[in-house]
Amino acid sequence: MSTRAPVELDFLGLRAAAADADDRHAKSGGSSASSSSSIRGMETSAIARIGPHLLRRVIAAARPPPPPSTAPVPEEMPGAAAAAAPMTLFYNGSVAVFDVSHDKAEAIMRMATEATKAKGLARGNAIVGNFAKEPLTRTKSLQRFLSKRKERLTSLGPYQVGGPAAVGATTSTTTKSFLAKEEEHTAS
């Protein structure tokens, strides 16, 4: 398994400045130091060599500064906007891919949105009409179900107030509420 070397991008052009400084230092008779030389056991990084005012400006900027003038700046081509790009449509269980320009794709999406909104309004009125025609037996059945469920939940509650007759128990032991038990406990 081969390992790839890390890629370093010199956004601020510091490699060229460091190389110039190394050349000047070598010409003056000093020993040549590379850009990763050690000073007292610490490696100097590119950020350590940047001036504080320049570093603040780079950090505050939303984008990195523009590349040096030697790098060509890509310009937008006027024909790029008219270039066709693939557009995928999913309709009625099928998938279709077309090469369409950006303007035509926007027009298609706008037309589909308007058609969907118009169908949604018409369909919404039809749904409301169907519920109005529905018989009341379902709503009455639902009300009966909810009332029985409420009765079951209240009968199984942890604090039964009504005694055994309310719950339907046949034992002779009496059930006291939580507050009554607490009052007996504090009184003793």
From Swiss-Prot:
Free-text function comment from the UniProt entry: Repressor of jasmonate responses.
InterPro entries: CCT_CS, TIFY/JAZ, Tify_dom
Keyword Nucleotide-binding: no
Protein name: Protein TIFY 9
Post-translational modification: Ubiquitinated. Targeted for degradation by the SCF(COI1) E3 ubiquitin ligase-proteasome pathway during jasmonate signaling.
This protein's domain notes: The jas domain (135-160) is required for interaction with COI1.
Residue numbers covered by motif Jas: 135-160
GO biological process, one term: response to wounding
Claim: Transmembrane is one of the keywords in the record: no
Biased composition (Low complexity): 28-38
Record-stated family: Belongs to the TIFY/JAZ family.
Residue ranges occupied by any Tify domain in the UniProt entry: 80-114
Pfam families: Jas_motif, tify
Annotated region described as Disordered, given as residue ranges: 20-41, 156-188
Xref: PANTHER family: PROTEIN TIFY 4A-RELATED-RELATED (PTHR33077), PROTEIN TIFY 9 (PTHR33077:SF5)
SMART domains, A to Z: TIFY
UniProt GO cellular component terms: nucleus
